[in-house]
């Protein structure tokens, strides 16, 4: 088998960031069955992808904070799939939880196009923006179809880049990311490989205000119980009133929905004592969708920590556990991107940041429910590890997914 030098593609998501590089062998193209799937089903697949992603990250470390944007990572991968062939193509779309025997690929990309259009609509109540950038080596010629599709379907901007000067290329990409995330993510790209010829960048930025803000005067320093042996002091925000809150016996957790102004909701899950693992094993996307449909309210005292956390992940490790292996190896077939040279993803990076305070949030992812009512309003004190999702409920899209094990860890 003739050898070839591998050139790198860099992928950044949520920021999500992929680096492509050149490799050796040609892979036969496999035709994906093309059957109809309504584009509104894309968010449902993203919910299952978020669930799988969280499972993998928890397996890697069950004692660390987790925070990521499934929609950002999925968008970046979907763009790569436009230029992928054969098994490389199949692995990417399967990992995104699309059934390739039932879904026409055109419906998948149309679904992403509609979703991104919806998410980027101007809102007076909150700010939610996404963006996609292609940084191209000055000597790299993209295939016309790939170039047209990523611009039309994903509204990607193309930027000529001098990758022969890695420092200047890093500066250019980082400036784009910093601007898109309003200064929240800076200097993400470092040590850019000399073989990089293309960087694909996706970012998402959200700033929302609580529909019912917390009163700063009620915020006090209190204990957060990291585990049986560790306690840390954190500022706890407090609020008393009518809340969409209930206890779910299936996941053995309290469920609290806090709405932002606009179409975004935060879903907080507080497991019963010692039941975090049970929560993570039994929570399903279907249950999450049921939670979001709950409208009943009950009186409750809510205590929630102010926090600022982030997550930075090597996507090569995470995505391999989800079944995406070819695209990072010499078996990659990304011949739909360019014919100039064989490509593979040489680096993938995802970074997401979250801030929750009294005013709101700033972030750059089958059984009967039982509402427990008591004579006295329950105290929902999130003073121990908890799980949360931030969801655009007009589309049921998981924007961010997180688990707080220690709110003092940035």
UniProtKB/Swiss-Prot annotation:
<keyword id="KW-0325">Glycoprotein</keyword>
<feature type="glycosylation site" description="N-linked (GlcNAc...) asparagine">
    <location>
        <position position="229"/>
    </location>
</feature>
<feature type="region of interest" description="RCL">
    <location>
        <begin position="360"/>
        <end position="381"/>
    </location>
</feature>
<keyword id="KW-0732">Signal</keyword>
<dbReference type="InterPro" id="IPR023796">
    <property type="entry name" value="Serpin_dom"/>
</dbReference>
<dbReference type="InterPro" id="IPR042178">
    <property type="entry name" value="Serpin_sf_1"/>
</dbReference>
<feature type="glycosylation site" description="N-linked (GlcNAc...) asparagine">
    <location>
        <position position="263"/>
    </location>
</feature>
<dbReference type="InterPro" id="IPR000215">
    <property type="entry name" value="Serpin_fam"/>
</dbReference>
<feature type="glycosylation site" description="N-linked (GlcNAc...) asparagine">
    <location>
        <position position="99"/>
    </location>
</feature>
<keyword id="KW-0964">Secreted</keyword>
<dbReference type="GO" id="GO:0005615">
    <property type="term" value="C:extracellular space"/>
</dbReference>
<dbReference type="InterPro" id="IPR036186">
    <property type="entry name" value="Serpin_sf"/>
</dbReference>
<feature type="site" description="Reactive bond">
    <location>
        <begin position="374"/>
        <end position="375"/>
    </location>
</feature>
<dbReference type="InterPro" id="IPR042185">
    <property type="entry name" value="Serpin_sf_2"/>
</dbReference>
<feature type="signal peptide">
    <location>
        <begin position="1"/>
        <end position="24"/>
    </location>
</feature>
<feature type="glycosylation site" description="N-linked (GlcNAc...) asparagine">
    <location>
        <position position="162"/>
    </location>
</feature>
<feature type="glycosylation site" description="N-linked (GlcNAc...) asparagine">
    <location>
        <position position="62"/>
    </location>
</feature>
<dbReference type="Pfam" id="PF00079">
    <property type="entry name" value="Serpin"/>
</dbReference>
<dbReference type="InterPro" id="IPR023795">
    <property type="entry name" value="Serpin_CS"/>
</dbReference>
<keyword id="KW-0646">Protease inhibitor</keyword>
<dbReference type="GO" id="GO:0004867">
    <property type="term" value="F:serine-type endopeptidase inhibitor activity"/>
</dbReference>
<comment type="function">
    <text>Contrapsin inhibits trypsin-like proteases.</text>
</comment>
<keyword id="KW-0722">Serine protease inhibitor</keyword>
<comment type="similarity">
    <text>Belongs to the serpin family.</text>
</comment>
<protein>
    <recommendedName>
        <fullName>Serine proteinase inhibitor A3K</fullName>
    </recommendedName>
</protein>
């Amino acid at each position: 088998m003739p050898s070839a030098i591998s050139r790198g593609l860099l992928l950044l998501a949520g920021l999500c960031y992929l680096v492509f590089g050149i490799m050796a062998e040609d892979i036969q193209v496999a035709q994906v069955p093309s059957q109809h799937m309504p584009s509104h089903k894309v968010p449902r697949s993203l919910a299952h992808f978020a669930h799988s992603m969280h499972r993998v990250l928890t397996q890697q470390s069950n004692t660390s904070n987790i925070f990521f944007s499934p929609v950002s990572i999925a968008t970046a991968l979907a763009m790569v799939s436009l230029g992928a062939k054969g098994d490389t193509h199949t692995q990417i779309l399967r990992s995104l939880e699309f059934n390739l025997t039932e879904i026409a690929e055109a419906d998948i990309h149309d679904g992403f196009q509609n979703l991104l259009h919806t998410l980027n609509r101007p809102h007076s109540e909150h700010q939610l923006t996404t963006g996609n950038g292609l940084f191209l080596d000055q000597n790299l010629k993209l295939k016309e179809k790939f170039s047209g599709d990523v611009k039309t379907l994903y509204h990607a901007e193309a930027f000529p880049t001098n990758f022969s000067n890695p420092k200047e290329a890093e500066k250019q990409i980082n400036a784009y990311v910093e601007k898109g995330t309003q200064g929240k993510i800076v200097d993400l790209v470092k040590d850019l490989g000399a073989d990089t010829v293309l960087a694909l960048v996706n970012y998402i930025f959200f700033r929302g205000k609580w529909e019912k803000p917390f009163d700063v005067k009620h915020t006090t320093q209190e204990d957060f119980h990291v585990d049986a042996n560790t306690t840390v002091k954190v500022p706890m925000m407090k609020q008393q009133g009518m809340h969409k809150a209930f206890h779910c016996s299936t996941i053995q957790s309290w469920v609290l929905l806090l709405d932002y102004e606009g179409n975004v909701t935060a879903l907080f899950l507080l497991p019963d004592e010692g039941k975090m693992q049970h929560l993570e094993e039994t929570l399903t996307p279907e249950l999450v969708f049921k939670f979001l449909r709950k409208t009943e309210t009950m009186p409750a005292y809510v205590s929630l920590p102010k926090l600022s956390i982030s997550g930075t992940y090597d996507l090569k490790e995470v995505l391999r556990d989800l079944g995406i292996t070819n695209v990072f190896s010499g078996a990659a077939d990304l011949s739909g991107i360019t014919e100039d040279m064989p490509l593979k993803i040489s680096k993938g990076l995802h970074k997401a940041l979250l801030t929750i305070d009294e005013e709101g949030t700033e972030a750059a992812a089958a059984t009967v429910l039982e509402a427990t009512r008591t004579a006295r309003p329950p105290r929902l004190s999130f003073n121990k590890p908890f799980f949360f999702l931030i969801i655009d409920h007009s589309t049921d899209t998981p924007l961010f997914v997180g688990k707080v094990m220690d709110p003092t860890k940035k």
